[in-house]
Amino acid sequence: MKFRKGRPKIPRLISEEPQFKLFKPAGTPGIELESEVLTFEELESLRLVDYLNQPHEEAADAMGISRRVFWNILKSARKKVADALINGKMIDIGGGYYKIRECNYEDECQRGRNCRYGVSNCLTLKKDSE
């Protein structure tokens, strides 16, 4: 019989996967740079609070998580971005444990298959391989 510590992890809701998933300092080859991995839910927390100016409570509700969990995700995201900017690291966006919040093609969706509109399996749970 397997026992789990704590509560089960709830997938975070994000609006969409970003179009651009890699940022690096100009003029330096990427192979020479250290990288900082920013998860999709960390990027979503930055988008909601710092870009859209939503209060933490609204942003946490939008992501389907508690304010405390939201704060921890946001704090981690800000630390990673600051480290990358100050120390000249590459920012690699990807991974995490999330679901896409909305899909504009729900009526035409084929559950369990790749979305023909490029939404990347919007109804399928995404999880890190870690």
Swiss-Prot record:
Coiled coil: none annotated. It comes from the Archaea. It holds the Pfam family DUF134. Transmembrane segments: none annotated. Belongs to the UPF0251 family. PANTHER family: PTHR37478, UPF0251 PROTEIN TK0562. HAMAP family: UPF0251. This is UPF0251 protein MmarC6_0272. The lineage of its organism: Archaea, Methanobacteriati, Methanobacteriota, Methanomada group, Methanococci.
